[in-house]
């Protein structure tokens, strides 16, 4: 099946014939998002690439007129951005890749959906500024992470990407234009909230709509002051390059503790003291992947048992100061906390890797290395609540996780979860990451099975540990844990998308 010729022509008249395609060998590329996704999605009927907000509006209005369902993509890195049903149109935003403004005085940047982390990050660094960079690598869309997800390693001193969302331009599911925040009153991009009720929470809550409520075509994001160098110093060549920072103002520490409760207490106290650019309990198996250059190197390191011994109950701390004196103060406070709670430094060979390469904290390209094992990996949890709540969630992981390990479905890494505090401990994010082998006949079912068991465990304990995925059956299952949000979500969807054309989901 393909789009009717008359509809195809309407769409081609909007963007030009060179920016729409329905050839099957091209559409095949849009059935897959990443290697670990074993679901066989249908091909879209066509892919179209607008270059402006006006063109996006025109496309959406054609879709409503002919009842054609659509979804939006940028980098195709995540689990979304595919045709969730047969007969859909994919709207690729890659041509809309302009940095429209970087305002150094009011500290915001205005961007389009196709702008990648690797485009924007160096530009703001040059100006002594930075922004929360989602832990997804350099090729990912900045806008997508601000309106959908966006967790990262340095949330201790900042927050999730969503908290930095300012004014934005939104094409509703019916093709109308809405300008949100100060932009609505023609007062510029600087503020997310204008007079009266705010619509920022309509575009996204803790998570976004996965394309289910129209298309955000421009956003402004808040910028922070950057304590690092304006031009990143690099040494070596890929994949063994390094990004060292001046050691008089930047230091990395990793401490191991007797139990997860001790890790939690140290994390809380560092938040109270408001120290650290980054403070987190990180994945230990993923860390081994990040700091090795081949699968063989990974297995040699992992089988040595070093990371299992040193990093199962560990806390990563990155301190940075404007001056050596500021750094020295934070370091003294940190050591007081660590010594009081019973922590001790991990093996020097582990910490040295971070001291030599700060990419982990600035997220230039290091994270792409998790794909190199050649198998699959997938996340579970991805929720947030208090620090204490997240550690209770972590302690419950063995209840369902060991079964998969014993059946040899996943890597034996039960502590491969991260907990990242936000805003100096006002809340925290958790993510459980697991690796599996594509050589297993049933590998496409493994991620779904782990996710299902994880959600069941959350429901059993009443944990707020998941970002409910955009699947109706799962949102209805989790809804009672989250103030019956699914009922409000459905009402909003019906009100704004009467034709149910904006990514209705599976």
Describe the residue ranges of each PLM region.
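Short beta-strand-to-loop capping motifs
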Residues: 51, 254-261, 316-325, 382-389, ...
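General beta-strand structural signal in soluble alpha/beta enzymes
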Residues: 20-24, 49, 70-74, 91-93, ...
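Long, structured ligand/cofactor-binding scaffold of large enzymes
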Residues: 31-130, 141, 145-153
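C-terminal cap/substrate-recognition region of VAO/PCMH-type FAD-linked oxidoreductases
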Residues: 204, 220, 231-240, 246-258, ...
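Conserved oxyanion/phosphate-binding beta-strand-loop segments in alpha/beta enzyme cores
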Residues: 10-34
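Conserved glycine-rich FAD pyrophosphate-binding loop
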Residues: 6-9, 37-38, 42-46, 58-61, ...
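FAD-binding subdomain of flavoenzyme oxidoreductases
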Residues: 100-102, 113, 118-259
């Amino acid at each position: 099946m393909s789009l009717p010729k008359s509809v195809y022509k309407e769409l081609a008249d909007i963007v030009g014939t060179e920016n729409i395609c329905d050839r099957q060998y091209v559409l095949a590329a849009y059935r897959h998002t990443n290697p670990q996704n074993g679901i066989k999605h249908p091909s879209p009927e066509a892919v179209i690439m607008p270059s402006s907000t006006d063109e996006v509006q025109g496309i959406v209005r054609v879709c409503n007129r002919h009842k054609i369902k659509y979804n939006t993509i940028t980098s195709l890195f995540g689990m979304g951005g595919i045709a969730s049903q047969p007969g859909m149109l994919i709207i690729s935003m890659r041509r809309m890749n302009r940095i429209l403004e970087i305002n150094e005085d009011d500290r915001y940047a205005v961007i389009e959906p196709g702008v990648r982390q690797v485009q924007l990050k160096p530009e703001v660094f040059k100006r002594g500024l930075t922004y929360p960079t989602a832990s997804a690598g350099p090729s990912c869309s900045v806008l997508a992470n601000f309106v959908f997800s966006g967790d990262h390693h340095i949330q201790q001193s900042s927050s999730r990407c969503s908290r930095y969302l300012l004014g934005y331009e939104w094409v509703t599911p019916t093709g109308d234009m809405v300008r949100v925040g100060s932009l609505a009153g023609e007062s510029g991009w600087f503020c997310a909230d204008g007079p009266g009720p705010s619509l920022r929470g309509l575009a996204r809550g803790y998570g976004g709509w996965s394309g289910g409520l129209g298309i955000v075509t421009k956003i402004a994001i808040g910028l922070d002051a950057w304590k690092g160098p304006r031009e990143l110093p690099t040494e070596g060549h890929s994949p063994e390059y390094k990004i060292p920072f001046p050691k008089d103002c930047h230091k990395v520490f990793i401490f191991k503790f007797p139990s997860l409760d001790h890790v939690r207490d140290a994390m809380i106290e560092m938040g109270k003291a408001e120290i650290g650019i980054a403070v987190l309990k990180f994945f230990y198996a993923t860390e081994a992947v990040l700091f090795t250059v081949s699968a063989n190197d990974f297995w040699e390191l992992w089988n040595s048992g070093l990371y299992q011994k040193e990093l199962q109950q560990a806390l990563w701390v990155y301190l940075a100061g404007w001056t050596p004196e500021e750094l020295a103060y934070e370091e003294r406070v940190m050591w007081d906390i660590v010594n009081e709670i019973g922590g001790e430094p991990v093996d020097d060979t582990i910490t040295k890797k971070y001291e030599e390469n700060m990419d982990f904290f600035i997220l230039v390209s290091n994270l792409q290395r998790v794909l190199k094992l050649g198998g699959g990996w997938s996340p579970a949890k991805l929720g947030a609540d208090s620090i204490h709540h997240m550690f209770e969630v972590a302690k419950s992981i063995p209840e369902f996780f060991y079964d998969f390990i014993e059946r040899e479905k996943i890597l034996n890494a039960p502590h491969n979860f991260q907990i990242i505090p936000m805003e100096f401990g006002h809340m925290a994010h958790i993510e459980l990451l697991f690796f599996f082998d594509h050589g297993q006949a049933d590998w496409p079912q493994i991620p779904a099975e782990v996710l299902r068991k994880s959600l069941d465990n959350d429901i059993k304990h009443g944990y707020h540990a998941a970002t409910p995925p955009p699947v109706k059956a799962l949102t209805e299952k989790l809804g009672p844990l989250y103030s019956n949000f699914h009922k409000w979500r459905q009402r909003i969807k019906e009100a704004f998308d009467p034709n149910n054309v904006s990514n209705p989901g599976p």
